[in-house]
Structure formats: structure tokens, C-alpha cells
Amino acid sequence: LRCLVGSEMCIRDSNMAMQPFKMMVGDMVNEKQKGLAYSIQSFLCNAGSLAGYLFPFIFAAIGISNIAPKGVIPDSVIYSFYIGALILILCVIYTSVKVKEFPPEEYAAYHGITHESKKEKTNMFKLLVKAPKAFWTVGLVQFFCWAAFMFMWTYTNGTVALNVFDTPVITTMTNGVSRVVLDTQSAQYQTAGDWVGILFAVQAIGSVIWATIIPMIQNRKFAYVLSLVLGGIGFISIFFIHNQYALFASFILIGCAWAAMLALPFTILTNALTGGHMGTYLGLFNGTICVPQIVAASLGGIVLKMFTSPGSVAPEVNMLVLAGVFLIIGAGCVSIIKER
């Protein structure tokens, strides 16, 4: 329970720290440069992710314990969280001090906000009704993308443990029903967990590299489609790979999709917004990140059970294939986005 509460607080607080800066890009950067600005944000986010994945290995290498009793978090992970919190606080303070927002009058002139529109009373429901079409079409793409990555975060560990490290299985009894599951106490499972951390670091490297390439592609929708298709290929390829090092290629491709997801939706949406309420719209747009993850987390177990034959271990790799299919569907949905 404490782990769940802690995870929820980390996710919530990181969103609270990051979203205002996404809004500032929309407020302060002109339309021609927004794509580059959001790509720079994507680059920096993924560089931070890479550092976060590497910190536990660095601490273990310098002698800080990465082993702990059951139910206890290793010191290497604890210190990584401390360092991450310190970096977050320092970066937020630095950005808040150094970045000067537009004065209200200049902001209104820059965004074409009239005195009458500022007096207009509205609420979130009215804003949703008046939302530009891009809000909904990009949101549809977001649904498939974030559901796919929720599957990745949930099922990669089991997939790598079974398909790559040949983790042994055991039979358990739950409410009188026997189930065949992976032996999570085995050395193979622990090794797989460590390797997944490395794979996520490789994904971050792929994202960092691809974030520098996205601004070079003139057609934004083509860049979006290409990124998601590459990510979909990466997910589907995991089904055929049984070598731990070959998985690097899969996760580099997945990183391409991740880089685009952090940059292009916000570029397209903020270019479609005019006048005021940009901050409110971006806050509402955050729902296109949360809702698909909730749906994927709620229904993923049911779908996985449909893939599982009686007396056999759940084929979690099928969920990653489904994630790849979702990204390719999302790429297809990009075609209905109409940019302003």
C-alpha cells in the first residue's frame, strides 16, 4: 500500500512540476518554433530519464548496496530517488528564476485576447464544447499511444523473464484455483528485472537521439506517423527476440515513439489554440494521458487472461504485441488531424 501511495505521489508531483513549463512553451514561443521547443523539452526529459535509470547502477558500482531483504528497498534505489528529487527541485527553481513570462497586457496582445473575451465567463465544460477539432483528434492518437506504453510498463518484466532468461514457473493456489506463474524469487527473474532497467535506459537513449531528428522533418504529421510506426515495429519485434542484447534494437525503436509523444501532440494542439484559456486546455488535455492508462490498467489483466491457455503461464509478450498494434493504429489516426 505504501509503495502504491508513493508511486502515485511521484507521478502526481512530477506532472505538477512539468505541466506548467509545457504551458509556458505554448504561451511564449511562436508557432514556427514550437516544434523545436517541444522537441528540446522531449530531449531533456529523456536525458533525465536516462540519468534516472543509470543512477542505481552507478551507486551499486561505487559500493552502495543494491540488495535488500524482501519488502525493503535497496539503498542504491533510495539514494537515486534522493538525487532525483534534488535535481527536480534545483531545475524548477532555476527555470522559475530565469524565465520571465509576458506581462498580462503583452500576453493579451501576442495572443489576440480582447478586453471583452477576458470578461467572458466560462467553465471547463463550455471550453470542451468549444475545443478545436485538433484537441479531440490528437486526443484519439494519445489514447492508443498511452495505452500501449501502459502495457509496456506493466508486462515488459514478465516478458523478458520468460522469453529471454527462461525463468522457471511454479504452480500457486488462489481461492482453490491453481495458476501457473513465473517464480519471482528465482535468480533468473531478478536478473530479468535488472535487464529491464537497462532496456528502459536504452529506450531513453533512443528517445534522446530521435528528439534531435524530429525538428529536421518538415512535415510534422509525417514525423508523428513515422515515429509511432517505428515504435510499433519495436514492440512487435519483441515477440521474435530471445537474445537480451538484440532487445536493444527493439527499445531504441520504441524510444522513437516516446520522443514524438512528448513533443508533437503539444505542438499541434498549442498551434490550434487561439486566445486565452491555453493553460486550461492543456490541463484538460492531460486527461488524454491519464484516461488511456486507467483503461489499459483496468482491462489489461482481462485481455491477458484471454490469451492464456489452461495450465500454462500467461504469455505477457502478447500484450507487447498488442501495444505495437495500438501504436500503428494511433499512427493511422494521425491522418484525421487537421493542423491550423
What residue ranges belong to the model's regions?
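Single conserved hydrophobic/aromatic residue that forms the stacking wall/gate
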Residues: 1-6, 11
